[in-house]
Every structure is written in structure tokens, then in C-alpha cells.
Amino acid sequence: MRRRLIALLSLLSVMTLVYLKPADAAEPGAAPAAESNGLRLLEEMQAVITELAETAKPSVVSLFPTNPLGKGRDVAPERVPNAPGSGAGVIITPAGHIITNNHVVGDSAEIEVRLSDRSKLIAQVIGKDPDTDLAVLKVTADRPLPYANFGDSSTVRVGQWVLAVGNPFGLERTVTLGVVSGIGRENVNLSRYENFIQTDASINPGNSGGPLFNLRGEIIGINTAIINFAQGIGFAIPSNMAKQVLQQLLEQGRVVRGWLGVGIQPLTPELARKFGVPEQEGVLVNEVFE
């Protein structure tokens, strides 16, 4: 499918040159042929997108936790929470492992999982990581389940086409198309560790935990939030971060991170002069935690 898409994009470039050719240089009857070729090109590109959607949707599940946000959980004002009791996830192994958002799972004792064939299963929580807003669930089925593979989010580029699939407002496996608007987004007050992919693919309450696919059908992100006072600004956790968290959650049910045990602040020129530090590089240790 990737070779087919490259060929279509190459043809699109040629067709663009045809349309931009001066009118007085065009031969009689050339315009109808160009229009016919252009329409055929668009239809073929559309077929690529629809094929991708049909391939990707079966791995996406709808989640219905009993207590999605948990008791006393604060939600950042920038994040629009899920519709009550709903969210999305994506199956990542044929054995039934599902990755989703931690804020979708919350403190739920059990989570109902609705598969693409409308069958329902109860999921067990394998592990959660609030610092990245990720969680892993496990369902047991009597058959191998359709699943999606992770892609390499380090190769994601701005302008790349992406598909978001989720459960907005309970509308299961809704597909939206967009582009990558930005990468490496930080300081958006959504989680402790932030390195988000920004996209304009439509993401709404209930999309949380659903996958962001590239045109190969690979997961490049886990949709997590939108800006509540803007349109077309959504964020996804990069797949490479998700894979690192996933490995620890599968092995030990939690993520273990190093802790230095000190508080630091930038070493400003004023502080450097005060402490007699000749260099103005580095940081100042201002607190030690026992």
C-alpha cells in the first residue's frame, strides 16, 4: 500500500503541473483529459484511505469503565474529559493486550471492552502509569484478536497524513483524517512527561486512548487530549514512549524511574557572582530530599 501511495502522490505532482500550465499553451481537448485523470487520481487516493480505515478499525475497541476518572482526580483545564463512562483503546497483541489512557481507566475495578464485532469482554488492568497517562489492559478471548503494530514515532514528520480512530460521544470506531501539525510538544499541562504529537485530525471526548495511525496502518500515537478552547488541536502520546512504558507495565505492572533526590534551579549570572562560581553553566542545587 505504501508503494501505491507513493505512486499516487507522484502522479498528483505531475497533474498539478498540468493544471498550472499556461492556458494558451494547452492543446485543444487537453483540459477534459486532465480533469478525467485528476478525478481518477483522487478516487485512487480515496481508495487508499478507505482501505486503511477498514484495516485499522478492527483493532480498535470501545471501553466502558465503572469509574473512569476515579475519586478526587483533578483534570487539567486544557483537557476535555471523556464522555461519561466511555473511551477507546487499541489491541496490540493477538492475546488481547490493550493500550489506552490512564485517565480512561481511572480507579475502575472492571472495564467492559466492546470489540469490533460487537461482542463484549471484561478487561483486567495489567498496569497504569499516571505520569504518561498510559494504561495496559488484558482480555481473554476464545480466538486470536485483530491487533495493530506500533510504528516508529521518531520518523514522524510535520505534514504527514494520519488517521485517528476512537469512540467520540459513544460513536464507536469513528475515523477522522488529518495531518501531523507538530511534534515534540511540551509544556501543555497534560501529564508529567510530555513529548506529544500534535494533529488536526478531529479528536473529541471519547477518543481518548484510541490510536493515531500512519498511512501504513501502524500506531504512531495514542490520542490523549484536545485543547478545550480551540479547534483542530489534539495531542497524542508518541508510540516510542508508549512502547517503553508498555514493556515495564507488562513486566512489573508499574513504571520505575530514577530519582535524584535534589531540587535544582538555573544558575543565573547573579547567583554565579554571589557564590563565586566562575562559569555560568549548570544548575544550582537548592534543596536535598531525605
Name what the model sees in each region:
Residues 8-17:
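Bacterial N-terminal signal peptides
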Residues 16-19, 159:
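Intrinsically disordered, low-complexity proline-rich regions
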Residues 26-290:
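Serine-dependent protease modules
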Residues 21-24:
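Sec/Tat signal peptide C-region and signal peptidase I cleavage site
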Residues 1-9:
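Bacterial N-terminal signal peptides that target proteins for export
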